[in-house]
């Protein structure tokens, strides 16, 4: 039974990473840029229907909705060789085309005004699915459209489709660069509230860490947006391989995420990927014969902080720990090696886990696309729920407090209806994020379950019966 997923791309960043994601999916499924199945793509063991549907003339169309308040990025996509891939009825550009001016309040207000037109598209796409499982939302938390309009759409999706999963790929700003968006701390705080309350699962894409990895691991001096987005598309595509190349476990979104999220609030996920190679490495063959990849080698490297795509900062008190881990392993893998590797990791205590739950390391073995050549025998993606992610939220709180204390740049927000009478929404958002930090800090302690129950955040009330049976490694 298909479990279709609709992808929503919002704003400049969301549409850019979404575009790279669809390019990669087309490559992996043997679909041409115009949506036609290539002659060589006769494997037949993949499930294209999760992310694509077939038009009357049999060409494949992404289950994607492209939304923006200014035209530049979407015009670039629709002017590319992939222009015939998308359903033009699923592309929405605001008629005035002025954008949100990097202002969350403007993006949110415009989302509210345009909701009828936008949800006509989303509802039509949902109605065209046989068994819709949920939505994937791609956006940035720091700008105007992806953060503001994205927040509005997230809230409405949760209201309109309460039984469907909402997973986001959320890009966090680069902390090593001075932002030209002066209200970025406000935008981030307001978006984080919605990611906490409206999303079921948030994959954090931290630009600080992505740039560091591009420099340190891929040896790219000044990584471009395109190179970073390519890295993101790898994370997105590998995280969905078990849905597109299904086996007996982890073959739907709830089965993938349920073991990672023990309580509703703790749903922010980190990623790691290894081995990493850049296009230049492949072309110059710099990495030939450097390493023989094995399951243990890959799983061990995934636990190294330098491979994590979130910059959490030093853990001076050494109290942060893993809540759960899912490793998606691709390549030539003997299942017995997986069990041996898991045992080795446990015996050597390579990872520190929560004191109130089991050592939860899940492993999903996934086939790779037969149409894309890999340079490695084995590769792996880690999706991890780790308490140190709260340092990212603490950083956002500190930046917000500095700006809010001075009362800086608030006039831009007061112009919009949501802030016309007062600034309560900002303060409530701060409180939500502060509670989130406390929740993750509490998760490092043995008494976490009592803390969580007091707050009314018991174990996840799943949106699917499937999740109750997902408890062991898919190997």
Curated annotation (Swiss-Prot):
Give the record's GO CC terms.
centrosome; cytoplasm; gamma-tubulin complex; gamma-tubulin ring complex; gamma-tubulin small complex; microtubule; nucleus; pericentriolar material
Q: Where is this region: Disordered?
A: 453-475
Q: Name one GO biological process term.
A: cytoplasmic microtubule organization
Q: Give the UniProt keywords, A-Z.
A: Cytoplasm, Cytoskeleton, GTP-binding, Microtubule, Nucleotide-binding
Q: Where in the cell is it found?
A: Cytoplasm, Cytoskeleton, Microtubule organizing center, Centrosome; Cytoplasm, Cytoskeleton, Microtubule organizing center; Cytoplasm, Perinuclear region
PROSITE patterns the UniProt entry points to? TUBULIN (PS00227)
**What Gene Ontology molecular function terms does this protein carry?**
GTP binding; guanyl nucleotide binding; microtubule nucleator activity
Entry binding sites for GTP? 142-148
Q: What happens when the gene is disrupted?
A: RNAi-mediated knockdown has no effect on nuclear positioning in fat body cells.
The protein's predominant localisation is cytoplasm
Family named by the database record? Belongs to the tubulin family.
Which PANTHER family does this chain map to?
A: TUBULIN
The record's function comment reads:
Tubulin is the major constituent of microtubules. The gamma chain is found at microtubule organizing centers (MTOC) such as the spindle poles or the centrosome, suggesting that it is involved in the minus-end nucleation of microtubule assembly.
Q: State how it assembles.
A: Interacts with Ote.
Quote the protein name from its UniProt record: Tubulin gamma-1 chain
Q: Which gene encodes it?
A: gammaTub23C
């Amino acid at each position: 039974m298909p479990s279709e997923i609709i992808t929503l791309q919002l704003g400049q960043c969301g549409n850019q990473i979404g575009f790279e994601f669809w390019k990669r999916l087309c490559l992996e499924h043997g679909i041409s840029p115009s949506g036609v199945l290539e002659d060589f793509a006769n494997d037949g063991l993949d499930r294209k229907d999760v992310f694509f549907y077939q038009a009357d003339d049999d060409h494949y169309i992404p289950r994607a909705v492209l939304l923006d308040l200014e035209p530049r990025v979407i015009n670039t996509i629709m002017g590319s060789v992939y222009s015939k891939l998308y359903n033009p009825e699923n592309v929405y550009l605001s008629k005035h085309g002025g954008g949100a001016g990097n202002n969350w309040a403007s993006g949110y207000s415009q989302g509210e005004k345009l909701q009828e037109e936008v949800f006509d598209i989303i509802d039509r796409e949902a109605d065209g699915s046989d068994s819709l499982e949920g939505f994937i939302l791609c956006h940035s938390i720091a700008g105007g459209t992806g953060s503001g309009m994205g927040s509005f759409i997230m809230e409405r999706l949760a209201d309109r489709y309460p039984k469907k999963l909402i997973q986001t790929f959320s890009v966090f700003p680069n902390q090593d660069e001075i932002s030209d968006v002066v209200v970025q701390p406000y935008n981030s705080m307001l978006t984080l509230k919605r990611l906490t309350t409206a999303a079921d699962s948030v994959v954090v894409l931290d630009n600080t860490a992505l740039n560091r990895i591009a420099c340190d691991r891929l040896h790219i001096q000044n990584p471009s947006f395109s190179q970073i987005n390519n890295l993101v598309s790898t994370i997105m595509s590998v995280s969905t391989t078990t849905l597109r190349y299904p086996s007996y476990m982890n073959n739907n979104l709830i089965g993938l995420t349920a073991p990672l999220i023990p309580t509703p609030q703790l749903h922010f996920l980190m990623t790691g990927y290894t081995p990493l190679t850049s296009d230049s490495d492949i072309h110059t063959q710099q990495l030939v014969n450097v390493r023989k990849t094995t399951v243990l080698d890959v799983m061990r490297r995934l636990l190294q902080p330098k491979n994590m795509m979130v910059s959490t900062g030093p853990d001076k008190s050494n109290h942060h720990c893993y809540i759960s881990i899912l490793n998606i392993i691709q390549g030539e893998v003997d299942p017995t090696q997986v069990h041996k590797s898991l045992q080795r990791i446990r015996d050597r205590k390579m990872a520190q886990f929560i004191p109130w739950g089991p050592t939860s390391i899940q492993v999903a073995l996934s086939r790779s696309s037969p149409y894309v050549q890999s340079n490695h025998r084995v590769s792996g993606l880690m999706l991890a729920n780790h308490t140190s992610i709260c340092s990212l939220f603490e950083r956002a709180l500190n930046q917000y407090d500095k700006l809010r204390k001075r009362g800086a740049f608030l006039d831009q927000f007061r112009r919009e209806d949501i802030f016309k009478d007062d600034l309560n929404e900002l303060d409530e958002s701060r409180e939500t994020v502060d509670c989130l930090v406390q929740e993750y800090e509490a998760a490092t302690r043995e008494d976490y379950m009592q803390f969580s129950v007091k707050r009314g955040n018991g174990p996840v009330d799943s949106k699917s019966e499937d999740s109750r049976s997902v408890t062991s490694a898919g190997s």
